[in-house]
Structures are given as C-alpha cells and as structure tokens.
Amino acid sequence: MEQSTAYERMMATAREWLAGKSPESLAANSGAQFDAARSVFTIRSFGEEVEIHYPDYSFSPEIDEWHQMSLLHYLNLADGTQPSGEWISLSMMASGMIRGGGFDKMFENLVRTKLGCLPAETVRVACEHMGMQVVGGNADLCVRHDFAPLFPVTMKLWFADPEDDLPGSGRMFVDRSADHFLTIEDTVTLCEYLIVGRLKRELGI
C-alpha cells in the first residue's frame, strides 16, 4: 500500500512538471508525435506505439507503471538533442559513478553467472521476442532496444566458452546524449527493471 501511494505521488509530481507546457514543444523536443485534433501524443517505446493523452497524461494501452513514469520524465526533460552515435556505460552519465556503476557491475555479474552461460541462440530469440533489434558489432550478440525516439539503448554480450575457460561478459550502453533526456536514476530504472527484468522473465532466470 505504501509503495503504491509513493508511486502515485511520484506520478502526480511528474504530471505537475508537465502542466502548462506546450504539447507541440514537448513533441518536437522528444521525437513524439502530437495529434492536436485528438489531444494525444504518440511515442514509440521498446518497439510499441504508446499513446499519452493530453492534458491528463494518461496512457493507452495500459503499460507498466514504471514505464509510464519514465516516459513522462523523458517528455519533461527532452530538449531535442540528437543522438551522437557514441555509446557510454551508465557510470559515465552525469552523477553516474555510484548508481550507474552499481548497475554496470550488477549486469556484468548477471551475464557472468547466468545470461552468458545460456546458448546464444536462446538469448537472441528472447531478445527479438521482446522487440529488440539485432545489430552488427564486435560482440557475440549485440542488440538495440530504443526506449524512446531519441533514447537508444544497446546491449553487448560475449558468451561463456567452457573449452577456453572464459566466462560470459556483457555491458549495456546508452548514447552520450542520454543526460539530455533522463536522470541517472531514471536510466537505471529503465535498464534494470524494464529491460533486464523483462529479459530475465523471458528466459526464466
């Protein structure tokens, strides 16, 4: 109950931040589309079209509550900066040394102990089922999963090689422009809960 109440307070705050802001400007700065006739934003997130109704900022279809909050924070902070094409770990974001560094270590440990021990094809299929796009790269598996139009996320995995006694290894990256759209706290939430958490459930690990 307390957790639900805390979430509701945070959502109320997120909506207050957006109150009075021009929906056209919000759309232009975030890469979303705004239909003035319907008073609806349309934004592509994790491969799906999400509608956000203006001015109450309700969602359809209903999506995970933390996904909703992250998108509202994205709309509020987005300043139109275009992705640079340069990838950084979460620890390299502003104020990311502790929260971002903690996530980097958690993900590396997950890959070393569980994710990287699975067959590469099994993980690839699970990633594609979640809407991730397999892209070229210097890893055994490299996938891209865009949280929002201007907020791409990539994941690189090297799978364990028992013959050479090499453990699995992996990193998750965001574009260097990430600080223009989300705080480190929001970025950790979306990477840990909305991406890694879903992938773990998809794989049953």
Can you name each region flagged by the protein language model?
Residues S25-Y54, Q133-A160:
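Amphipathic, interaction-prone secondary-structure segments
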Residues D175-I205:
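A recognition module on extended beta-rich or small alphabeta surfaces enriched in W/G with H and D/E
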Residues L118-L182:
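Conserved binding-pocket/active-site segment within a compact domain
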Residues M1, A12, E16, A36, ...:
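N-terminal leader/targeting peptides and immediately adjacent processing regions
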Residues E48-H73, W158-E185:
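Intrinsically disordered, low-complexity regulatory segments enriched in Ser/Thr/Pro
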Residues M1-G31, M92-C142:
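Negatively charged, low-complexity tracts enriched in Asp/Glu with abundant Ser/Thr
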